């Protein structure tokens, strides 16, 4: 459709998200299908279509919005975390594949972002933003675009999120399971 209209896409931003809370076994199959389609199939098809055009032109930018959950075992959002892990690997693979043709691909891995995705009252949102636990959407977009135009393959906005991702990558699975069994932590999930 865009090619037929003579529209050339120079920057593609794959940024869509829907959260599926609760145990996976209790999730309606059609909801699981929707999250996989939105987070995996749609970006893959868009990147295939517009990435090929960019490759032929020898220039272009693709930003793939993933999530810090791509590195974290996260009970109650297994489908979300798994699809965001797909996007992490997908963005990295595309970066290797397209870089030699002048197309830059950046994966962005924010933590909690202040969007309607989270059902929080205003005071709680302000606190989380002030403490750096949650980021404003504008900040995440700014960090992601800066990384994209600088040719970086990945971007983790926010100090708190960087620390969480680092810890989750270093902590063995058995220790993570123990932490998730602590009553105060378990209540969060």
Residue ranges and their predicted role:
Residues 47, 83:
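Active-site helix of classical SDR
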Residues 25, 74-78:
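Active-site loop immediately N-terminal to the catalytic Tyr-X3-Lys motif
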């Amino acid at each position: 459709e865009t090619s037929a209209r003579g529209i050339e896409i120079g920057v593609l931003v794959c940024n869509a998200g829907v959260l599926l809370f609760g145990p996976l076994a209790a999730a309606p199959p059609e909801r699981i299908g929707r999250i996989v389609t939105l987070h995996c199939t749609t970006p893959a098809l868009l990147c295939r279509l517009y990435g090929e055009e960019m490759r032929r032109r020898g220039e272009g930018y693709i930003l793939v919005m993933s999530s810090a959950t791509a590195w974290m075992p996260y009970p109650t959002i297994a489908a979300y975390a798994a699809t965001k892990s797909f996007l992490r690997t997908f963005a990295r693979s595309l970066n290797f594949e397209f870089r030699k043709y002048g197309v830059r691909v950046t994966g962005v891995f924010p933590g909690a972002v202040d969007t309607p995705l989270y059902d929080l009252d205003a005071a709680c949102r302000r606190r989380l933003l002030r403490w750096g636990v949650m980021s404003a959407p504008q900040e995440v977009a700014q960090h992601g675009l800066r990384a994209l135009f600088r040719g970086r393959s990945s971007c983790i906005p926010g100090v708190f999120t960087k620390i969480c991702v680092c810890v989750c990558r270093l902590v063995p699975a058995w220790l993570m399971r123990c932490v998730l069994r602590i009553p105060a932590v378990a209540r969060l999930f």
